[in-house]
Amino acid sequence: MFDFMTLEKVWEKGPLVHNITNIVVANDSANGLLAIGASPIMASAKEEMDELAKMADVLVINIGTLDGELVTAMKIAGRAANVAGTPVVLDPVGVGATSYRRKVVQELLAEIQFTAIRGNAGELAAIAGEAWEAKGVDAGVGSADVLSIAEKVANEWSTVVIISGEVDVISDGTRFAKVANGSALLPRITGSGCLLSAVCGSFMAVQDDAFRASVEACASYAVASEYAEIELERKLPGSFRPQFLDALASWSVEKTRAKAKIQESGEHK
């Protein structure tokens, strides 16, 4: 099923990815999208959200650094994207960390139909209402079954769920996949998950099957990180960051197919 031709489609189409994202990761996210052939726009003024919805091929909403004006812009943009039939991705950064973040995410989920939600296990557990010891915006630890969390959130909100971790879990509520790729250096650079959300969005902009787009995006991204690590003389985050950007710029269908480790099932067992 996963031939990774979505990766080629991103290069061919160069989708316009509208990011309402956080101040920590905006630059890296924009450069990462440019590296894979997408066209990023980082805009958050509420006055232009309706107009941008008519232009963008996908909208990515990231709650990493919130304020009231930004939340208003997110809601306007999300509703406009729904009207336009544009895919919308939510990255609920640190949703379990504070009551304000939980409130904002619940409001966004109530007002916007999201094509996909991508986060770590702690963030998706918070949305699912499952007990989990999150550590700020990091995943933390918990005993809940990650597949069950993915299934619950996917079915409750009619969306594709992407739970990033040592093994990525992707589900649309009926289909499940695990991606067992990725460099151990990825979690040592800030914003790697936020960029993945944007990359998933760029794949959804050119592939109507959001589940397939998500699996192929996660695998392509993780495999690129492995190639980046191979090129390093020193396995350190400061060296890895630019090398990973280069790996994204030089990724290919052939490279991804050669190393992708995907386990797919039709149901949660």
From Swiss-Prot:
Job description of the protein: Catalyzes the phosphorylation of the hydroxyl group of 4-methyl-5-beta-hydroxyethylthiazole (THZ).
Which cofactors does it use?
Mg(2+)
Give the family this protein belongs to, as stated in its UniProt record: Belongs to the Thz kinase family.
Q: Which GO terms describe its molecular function?
A: ATP binding; hydroxyethylthiazole kinase activity; magnesium ion binding
What Pfam families does this protein's entry cite?
A: HK
Positions that bind ATP? 118, 164
NCBIfam families per record? PRK09355.1, thiM
- Could you tell me what this protein is called? Hydroxyethylthiazole kinase
Q: What is its EC number?
A: 2.7.1.50
Q: Which reaction does it catalyse?
A: 5-(2-hydroxyethyl)-4-methylthiazole + ATP = 4-methyl-5-(2-phosphooxyethyl)-thiazole + ADP + H(+)
Q: Where does substrate bind?
A: 42, 191
The UniProt entry, under InterPro entries, shows: Hyethyz_kinase, Ribokinase-like
Report which residue ranges the record marks as coiled coil.
Answer: none
Q: Which domain of life is it from?
A: Bacteria
Q: Report the pathway entry.
A: Cofactor biosynthesis; thiamine diphosphate biosynthesis; 4-methyl-5-(2-phosphoethyl)-thiazole from 5-(2-hydroxyethyl)-4-methylthiazole: step 1/1
Which keywords does this Swiss-Prot/TrEMBL entry list? ATP-binding, Kinase, Magnesium, Metal-binding, Nucleotide-binding, Thiamine biosynthesis, Transferase
Its Gene Ontology biological processes? thiamine biosynthetic process; thiamine diphosphate biosynthetic process
